[in-house]
């Protein structure tokens, strides 16, 4: 298991080392369907994102709205992505993030591998420990203490990767504290030989260690620049301690999107998601005019952010994606 950062000095210097070698790779669309979206709504966003050149469509994996009534109700993330996989052709697909509390590791390995095959090898798995206790209570899902949730996450990652990497014709076994696998044929296999795994969050020790052991991408969602730098540094130290090359990890961030050609359009989009413009501006670099957003992204780029997830909360506003692609991404490409 990779160690935690050895000293404060190593943490503070690491973001500059990251920034020296990285630039934005791509922009991805990220939706929250539990707030109120049908499968058709999500498909429309995915198709628009694909047509506009975004590299990926990601969705949350939640069963309960954080605010509002969430009508018409939640949609299952992997059922949804299976459908979208058959109705798109190039855009990558994934979860940000699947909760390890929702599914047993064996069935999850099967579902992810199947959707990867259905998509022709375009799936990525974001996996986390789970945090939203109310949704577990609402849908009869056990919600163990935080330490146990992280233990289960680690075991799930070992089982998922173990099953996928077991050669065809051989079997996989695992004996852990929470899960046991006996004589599994470890089928089906994903289409991708090394299906990307994304781990994220702000945990100081176990999160960076798990990322260094299992992930090809580390994501920090909705945090200020200083917090992002600190967490990227922890992960970079863990990657180095694990003996991995520095460029084997992609560093990403997620932010709320609220862009407009002028202040009136920005205000209208903020109102559509029941947020105040100034509050959004203070918490996300993706809020403002295209020129403003390009400027605000600069420090995040310098801090080592390679990939940006646009949290699109109003899924009916496809013009929003068009504006960002045409006026922001164009300036950064």
Describe the role of every protein-language-model region.
Residues 2-3, 9-333:
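Active-site-adjacent structural elements that line small-molecule/cofactor binding pockets in enzymes
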């Amino acid at each position: 298991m990779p160690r935690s950062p050895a000293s404060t000095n190593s943490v503070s210097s690491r973001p500059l080392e990251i920034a020296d070698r990285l630039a934005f790779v791509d922009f991805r669309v990220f939706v929250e369907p539990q707030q109120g979206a049908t499968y058709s709504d999500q498909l429309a966003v995915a198709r628009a994102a694909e047509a506009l050149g975004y590299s990926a469509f990601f969705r949350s994996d939640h069963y309960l709205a954080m605010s509002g009534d969430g009508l018409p109700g939640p949609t299952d993330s992997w059922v949804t992505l299976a459908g979208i996989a058959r109705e798109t052709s190039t855009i990558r697909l994934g979860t940000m993030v699947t909760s390890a509390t929702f599914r047993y590791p064996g069935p999850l390995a099967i579902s992810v591998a199947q959707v990867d095959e259905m998509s022709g090898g375009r799936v990525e798995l974001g996996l986390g420990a789970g945090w939203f206790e109310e949704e577990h209570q609402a849908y009869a899902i056990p919600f163990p203490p935080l330490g146990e949730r992280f233990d289960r996450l680690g075991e799930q990652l070992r089982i998922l990767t173990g099953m996928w990497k077991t050669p065809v014709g051989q079997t996989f076994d695992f004996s852990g504290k929470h899960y046991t696998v006996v004589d599994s044929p470890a089928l089906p296999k994903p289409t991708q030989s090394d299906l990307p795994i994304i781990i994220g969050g702000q945990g100081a020790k176990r999160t960076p260690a798990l990322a260094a052991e299992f992930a090809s991408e580390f994501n920090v969602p909705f945090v200020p620049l200083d917090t992002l730098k600190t967490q990227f540094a922890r992960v970079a130290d863990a990657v180095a301690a694990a003996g991995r090359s520095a460029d084997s990890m992609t560093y990403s961030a997620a932010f709320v999107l609220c862009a407009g050609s002028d202040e009136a359009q920005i205000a209208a989009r903020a109102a559509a998601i029941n947020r105040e413009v100034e509050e959004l501006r203070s918490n996300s670099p993706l809020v403002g005019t295209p020129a403003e957003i390009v400027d605000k992204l600069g420090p995040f780029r310098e801090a080592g952010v390679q990939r940006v997830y646009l949290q699109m909360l109003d899924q009916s506003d496809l013009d929003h994606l068009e504006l960002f692609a045409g006026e922001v991404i164009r300036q950064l490409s």
